[in-house]
Every structure is written in C-alpha cells, then in structure tokens.
Amino acid sequence: MLWFQGAIPAAIASAKRSGAVFVVFVAGDDEQSTQMAASWEDEKVREASSDNFVAIKIDTKSEACLQFSQIYPVVCVPSSFFIGDSGIPLEVIAGSVSADELVTRIHKVQQMHSLKGETSVTNDKQSESSVSTPSASFEPDICESAESRNTELCETPTTSDPKSDTAAGGECAGHDSLSQEPPGCSNQRPAEDLTVRVERLTKKLEERREEKRKEEAQREIKKEIERRKTGKEMLDYKRKQEEELTKRMLEERSREKAEDRAARERIKQQIALDRAERAARFAKTKEAEAAKAAALLAKQAEAEVKRESSTRDRSTIARIQFRLPDGSSFTNQFPSDAPLEEARQFAAQTVGNTYGNFSLATMFPRREFTREDYKRKLLDLELAPSASVVLLPAGRPATSIVPSSSGDIWTLLGTVLYPFLAIWRLISNFLFSNPPPAQTSARATSTEPSNSASSSKSEKREPVRKRVLEKRGEDFKKEGKIYRLRTQDDGEDENNTWNGNSTQQM
C-alpha cells in the first residue's frame, strides 16, 4: 500500500484536490494490527486502492491519533476509516480482515463514492439551469471561494486542541451547509457578509490559538518548576543515601578491622600455645628417643656378648652328622681340637659290625679321608662347627652308598621303597632325634659342653620346626604329637562351638 508521508491536514487537502477517498488506518503493536498491516500490503489490495484513494497510517500512541479520535471515535485497534468528500465515513473496518475481504470492502467504497459523485453533478446542473441572471451565475463562484476558505479553516484546527476542533467543526459544518446551497447563497447572502463572517471566524481562531499558546507556556513553566523541584528532591535523596551508605561502609570497615585485630590476637595466642606444646612434645620425644637408644645399645651389647660367647662355644665344639649307607643318620658333638679318629671310633661303636671296616668321607665337597687325615683335628679339616660325613664300607666305591640285596625281589622293593624310607628317616631324625648317650666315662666329660651346644642348636631349630608345622597345618591335623591327613569332616568339626555345659552347638 502506498501510504501518504505527510500530516493529516495535507492528506485531507490532497484527497480534496483529487476528489479521492481519504483512508485512515489506525494501527497498534498487537498481533491483529500486524495481520491487518500485512493485508494492506497485499498485492491485490495495492491494485484495488491504486486509484481514487489517499491513505495514511497512524499509530495509536501518536498525537495525530488523539486528534483524529476527537472527531472520529476509535472503538478498537486496528481500525480502517474510509471518509468521503463531505467528511462522512463511507465504511469503517474494525479489527483485522483478510486481503480478499479488504479488496471487497474497497470495491464497495468505490461504488458508494462514484454514486455520490454522480448525485452532486446532477444537483449542480439543476441549480445552473434555474439561475437566469448574470449576477446569479457570479454568486456561486463567490460561494465556492467561501467554501474553499471554510474547508481550509476546518483543516487547520485539526492540529490544535480538541475544544477548538469541535468549535471550529461546528462553524465549518454551518458554512458547509451554506456552501452546499449555491442558489440560496446567490439570493440571500451577499459576498460582503461572507467576508465579514470569515474574518470574524479567523479572528476567533487566532484568539483561541493565542490562548492555547499562553496555556501551553504556563503549562511548560509549571512543568519546569515541577521538574526542578523533583530534581532537587532527587538530589537531596541521593545525597542522603550516599551519606548513609558512606556511614554504613565506615562502620563496617571499623567492625572488620576490630574483628581482624581480634582474629590476629587469637592466632598469635594459638601459635604460642602450639609452639609450647610442640617444644614439650619434642622434649618428651627426645627423652624417649634417648631412652630407646640407651636400651637399644644395651640390647646390642648384650647380643654382642651372647654372640661372642656362642661363637666361642661354636668354635670349641664340632657337631658331626654321620650318614649311614641305608639312609639313616645320627649326630654327636666333639671338641673342635679332637682328631678325626675320635669321631671314627664313635661311629664304629655306634654302628658296630654292621658295615665292617669303613672309612669316612664328605659329599660337599667330595672328599674321602685317609689315614693321615684321621690324625688331624676337626677344626683343621674344616669340620667345625658342623659337618656331615658319610660312612663308606670297605671295598665299595665312594659313589656306591646303598648296598645291593641278594635277591631280585628285595632289590626291586628296596629300589622302590628306598626314597620314601630315606625321607621318613630324615624327617624323624630331624624332628625327634636326641643325642646318643655317652658310652664311656671318659667321653662323658667331653660331651657335657657339647650337650649345651646341642641344646642351643635345638633352640635355634625351634623356629624352623614351627615354620614347617605351620606349613603342614593346611594339609595335616595335629592331635597331640601325632599328625594325620585332613578330611572334609575335620573342617566341620572345627567350626562347631561348645557351650558352657559341654554340649556341642552347631
């Protein structure tokens, strides 16, 4: 839609000059106004309203809308007014309509406007035919000029206040009625009367405009006074607020400083207490560490003394284990400076004539002792403080330890059962072996220190036995000194509990 870009009076004058319909579209910010504006911008509407239409678009919040609503009440927004030449609305569209409906309304307004135009033309022809004198043909021109002046006077007050608009509208209506009667005007009123009335109306309009300007000036003065008063009050209020805010900030700052000082004092006191406590704890720790160090030194000295004594005892005693060809063994202690012959004699007394004449040898390192070695000391032969020697029967090689049986069956059984018997004897001798009794009174005196050494050795062997027993505990069950294999029922028996009266509780 091609909207008129000037003010309402200019749009009215343009419509009057071209004899077109004056269209006023009052729009707002709501959705219906947007839809109606879209309908006005439609291509069909543009084509239908391209001729004989002068359209203007005003906003509901503008001053032009307020002035327009004083003459034509705006019932709803959006609204579209189609106003004819006489100022009478030909059509009013309230709300939003579609583009097709708007095109229909525009065609209807065009028909109404064309009918009114034809009626006015016929009236003019009849009036001209009824006039016969030259003066009568002159007076309509005067009336037309008066009518044009009156229309200008009616158009100018639209920019003024509503009261002057209504008053001027009444006068304009009277003059319009006079101007619409050209024959009566030529017969009843002379041209001078019309000029006087126009001058009088112009003077009244000027007076009212002057009054309005004075009222506007007074209102502006009052507004300025109110504005200055309000500004002063606002400045006073802001100054008071700033003073109160500054006062509160100073109080808050003072309170924070006091709290900080108190917090620093508390922290200093706590630091002093912590230092004193730490110093006391450090002193106690030092004393405890000194006591522990003294006790540790005493224990170390005692252990050193015990170690030296045990070393001396071990250096004076040689513990010899004799291993027999059948896998069994026995142990005895000898003085470290005793000759090897004494150990051989002890073995011969213990074994008897089972193996006949035999010799002694070590397996690690492999060494078979000769007759010269029997005269040497055990310490010199590196058999102190402990050693393991093997009895080798005479006439057998050193590698042959187990004697062969005469029968094949016994040989086979011996071969199969020998590892198990050897393991059993080794375990039994290791766990339950006791030193053999002294066989001579002369040897009893020499074996007394050796017994004490063997007891110390057995004490050292106790942890080893405990570890072996702990390892066996998973697969064996101990009942006194007897071990037997575990079964599934043993685990259930161990989980049973017993109450106070010796009855079993599952």
Swiss-Prot record:
| Biological process according to GO | ERAD pathway; response to unfolded protein
Per the record, membrane topology reads: Peripheral membrane protein
Q: Which InterPro entries match?
A: Thioredoxin-like_sf, Ubiquitin-like_domsf, UBX_dom
Q: Which domain of life is it from?
A: Eukaryota
Quick check: keyword Nuclease in the entry?
Answer: no
Q: Which UniProt keywords apply?
A: Endoplasmic reticulum, Membrane, Nucleus, Phosphoprotein, Unfolded protein response
Which part of the chain is the UBX domain?
313-391
Question: Compositional bias (Polar residues) at which positions?
Answer: 114-136, 177-189, 496-506
Summarize subunit and interaction data from the UniProt record for this chain.
Answer: Directly interacts with VCP. Interacts with UBQLN1. Forms a complex with VCP and UBQLN1.
Summary of the function given for this chain in its UniProt record: Involved in endoplasmic reticulum-associated protein degradation (ERAD). Acts as a platform to recruit both UBQLN1 and VCP to the ER during ERAD.
Name under which the protein is recorded: UBX domain-containing protein 4
Tell me which species this is from.
Rattus norvegicus
